[in-house]
Structure formats: C-alpha cells, structure tokens
C-alpha cells in the first residue's frame, strides 16, 4: 500500500524487526538476558555489553519499544510539525513523523546492537522454571535476567468500546487518512497532546474526562491553562463526563455514537487514552516464582530485584511512573546490580514529567494537593514569566513557575512549571533536588540575561527575602546606624 511516508515505514521495519533475521545460537551461559527492547531493555543490554559481559536481548515485536514506535517520538514529531506550520496538512504531518521515526531507528536497530556485542533474539519470551527463560522453544542459560517488557494501552470495560476497535497510541500513528472527527477518552497527557495535534489538523475533536478538569493530576492553574488552550484550538471538552457506552451510529452511517451523561456524540473515530497495563501476562511468571500486583505490575524492591532474586525488572512493567527517562535511570541500576554488587537503589529518584501541549506543563516531586493531603506544611514561591524582560519581549512569553518548599526552609519538595518551554525549565530544579540543594543555592548562580531561566533566580531571591524578618531588619538597622 502506498501512502505519504510509506517508504520510511518500510525502512523502520527493516531496521527494527528485519523479516529475514535468523536468531543466533546460544554459546554458553549469558551474564544477562534482557526481555524487551524498549528504553529500559535497550539501555540495560548495551550498557552491560559495553562492560564486556555476555548479553542476550529478546524482543517480540520491534526494537525501540513504545517510545520510538508508538509513543514519545511520533507524538512529539506531530506536535512540532503542527505547531510550526500554520495550516498543517494531514498527509505531510504524518509523513514527517514517519521520516523522524526512520531517522532514529538505526540507533535502536538489530544491527547496531549486534555490532555492540548483544545477541538479539526476535520472538516471544517465557519462563519454564525459576532459573530459565526461553525465546520460543530455545532456552537461554543466564546468570541474571532482566524483565523490561513495558506496558500497553488499557481498554476499560465500557460497553461496546472494545467492539468498536478503538484507536490507541499503538495504532493512531499508523493512520493513512485523516479522520473526519475524533472522540478521545481520557484527558491525561496522551489525550491532551493528541487532541491538540488533531485539532490543528482541522479534525473535529471531542475530549472526554471523568474528572472536572483536564490533566487532573496537575495543579488546578496548570490544568486550567491547558484546558483554555485546547478550547482555543477548537477542541470540545466534556469534563465530569463518564462515558457510558460506545456503539455504531443509529443512522447507519460509518462511525460511532459515544454515550455520555445521557447524550450522544457522533464521531468517525474513537481513541482510548485511559491508562496502561503491563505486558507481563505471557511470560509465565508464576513458574519463575515472580510476584505481581493485581494490575500485573512486577513487584520489585528498591534495587529492582523481584521475588526471584535471580530476576530483576525495570521500566513500565514495574511502575506507575511510566516515562522513558525513568526507565533509563532504572536500566543503569540494572547494569550495576546484575553484573556487580547490588548497590544501586532507585527509591529516591527525582522523576519529572511533562505534557507537551501549548503551553507545556512540567512537574516534579509533590504538589500542593499531595502536600495538603499528607498534612505537610509548605511554602509556595511563584513567578510569572511575563514579568521577565525576556517574557515581555516574547509573543508566547506567558506562563508561571511554582516551587514548593518545606515550611520555613529552602528544601524543595516539588515544582510545577507552565509555559512553552516548561520541560526544559524544570531541569535545573531536578538538578537541585537530586543533589539535595535548597532553593537558595540557585541564587548563587549566574543566569544569562535575558532568558526565561532567570525565573529560578527570582524564586531564590523571594526565598531569601522571606528570611529578612523584622528581627533581622532591626539588627541591620542597628548595624547601619552604628557604621554611619
């Protein structure tokens, strides 16, 4: 089938899952067998191989996992394309995402990992005992095993939803024709980002969310900023709206009827963005004595060991913090703990997250909702980017930053940033938190002028001013009077 960008798809497939590939024959015991070639698995495998160990990597679909194939890369390519072009064309936008994906594919390819010393096996993995895993019928002897199988979109038990064959992140980027209209179930990060993309492509978009606001896990001000932006882009928001059923249209026309709060919304396509479930059900974990939660997440300790101490796990199959950068950090711990003494812990990682709408929303640590629910006293320091000289000079110079500190202290508990570069601006706060540096430490740094990064120095100044109590002021006054 020919469509714009189809040659890029062929290139990507040939690199990530070559059809004529023949699995190697195991030669002795592996130091590490990694199951799953997404971010956690790729980094674990190439990191271990780079240290000289003997490594096998098993992948049942395509190298690169969700991030490259059906997640971060294609979604950000579409967001960038539709933001840059005033009247973006659907075919050209999707051809661009395919070109971007094909350009990154060599980095995650079977060939690259083979050249790095990793034995790549394409096929289904499963345990046949507590100490042995197979790819197909082939056992792979291993000293240690790392499960990095990721997660996939959940299809909740809404009547008629599964039968409607809805789009998910695994299929939406394969579209070759523009939908006439789109109902998106779930206004988390994925739902909001894709709503913005398709609205920019002149698709009629309906976004449904059970909570009273989009991005319900963010602070209210951030949610409201994104909600307003989505409305301005043409998205129809259905908030506090529990979808009751999805059915074929009554009038016989192609498409779907989404029932919500007693009303019917007609759309040509439905997309589900209502959470994710781990890819663990085919691994035969019980035979290996590996415990899971009710949701199927693999239970690990702070060193990523499972209940089978020979087996470790990392990435989306273990955690509700399902971000590529989190998987990256866990994978680095996997390399240390499986090859050497298990000294690397992941229980105190500082994990930011970002929604790449316009404006972007980035957060790290705890926010006021978490702190108040836990009964923690805190101070909030806030600064609006429009008050910066750079912000005044920019057309999109609005947005704000909030930093939450321990009451009466500069210890940072969390932060929220809203603005067109929030994902970049959250980084120095993560650096401070990771190194246990307080907000006042930012006041000692020099920031280029005029930049939006100056917000952090302004927040540090605000904290330092808070220490100028009446008692301190009286001492200063006395000293200045004495030295006059």
Model features per residue range: what roles?
Residues 162-178, 264-340, 428:
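FAD-site-proximal beta/loop scaffold in flavoenzymes
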């Amino acid at each position: 089938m020919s469509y714009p960008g189809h040659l890029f798809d062929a290139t990507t497939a040939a690199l990530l899952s070559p059809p004529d590939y023949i699995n190697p024959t195991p030669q002795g015991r592996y130091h590490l067998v990694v199951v799953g070639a997404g971010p956690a698995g790729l980094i674990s495998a190439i990191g271990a191989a780079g240290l000289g160990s003997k490594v096998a990597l098993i992948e049942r679909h395509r190298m690169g996992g969700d991030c490259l194939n059906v997640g971060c890369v294609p979604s950000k390519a579409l967001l960038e394309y539709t933001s840059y072009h005033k009247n973006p064309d659907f075919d050209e936008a999707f051809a661009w995402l395919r070109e971007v994906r094909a350009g990154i594919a060599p980095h995650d390819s079977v060939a690259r990992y083979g050249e790095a010393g990793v034995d790549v096996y394409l096929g289904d993995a499963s345990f046949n005992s507590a100490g042995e895993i197979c790819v197909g019928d082939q056992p792979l002897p291993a000293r240690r095993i790392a499960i990095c199988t990721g997660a996939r979109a959940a299809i909740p038990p809404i009547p008629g939803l599964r039968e409607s064959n809805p789009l998910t992140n695994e299929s939406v980027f394969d579209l070759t024709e523009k939908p006439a209209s789109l109902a998106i179930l779930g206004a988390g990060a994925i739902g909001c980002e894709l709503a913005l993309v398709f609205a920019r492509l002149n698709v009629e978009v309906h976004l449904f969310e059970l909570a009273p606001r989009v991005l319900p896990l963010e602070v209210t001000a951030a949610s409201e900023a994104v909600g307003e932006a989505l409305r301005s882009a043409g998205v129809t928001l259905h908030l506090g709206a529990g979808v009751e059923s999805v059915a074929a249209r009554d009038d016989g026309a192609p498409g779907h009827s989404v029932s919500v709060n007693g009303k019917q919304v007609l759309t040509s396509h439905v997309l589900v963005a209502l959470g994710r479930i781990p890819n663990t059900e085919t691994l035969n974990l019980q035979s290996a004595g590996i415990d899971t939660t009710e949701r199927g997440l693999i239970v690990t300790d702070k060193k990523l060991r499972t209940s089978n101490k020979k087996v470790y796990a990392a990435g989306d199959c273990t955690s509700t913090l399902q971000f590529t950068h989190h998987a990256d950090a866990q994978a680095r711990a996997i390399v240390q703990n499986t090859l050497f003494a298990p000294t690397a812990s992941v229980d105190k990682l500082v994990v930011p997250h970002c929604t790449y709408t316009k404006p972007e929303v980035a957060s790290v640590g705890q926010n006021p909702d978490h702190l108040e629910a836990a009964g923690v006293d805190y101070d909030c320091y806030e600064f609006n980017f429009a008050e910066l000289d750079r912000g005044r000079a920019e057309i999109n110079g609005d947005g704000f930053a909030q930093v939450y500190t321990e009451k009466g202290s500069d210890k940072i508990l969390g932060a929220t940033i809203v603005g067109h570069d929030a994902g970049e601006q959250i980084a120095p706060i993560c650096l401070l938190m990771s190194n246990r540096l307080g907000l006042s430490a930012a006041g000692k740094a020099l920031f280029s002028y005029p930049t939006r990064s100056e917000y952090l120095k302004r927040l540090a100044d605000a904290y330092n001013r808070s220490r100028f109590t009446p008692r301190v002021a009286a001492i200063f006054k006395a000293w200045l009077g004495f030295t006059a």
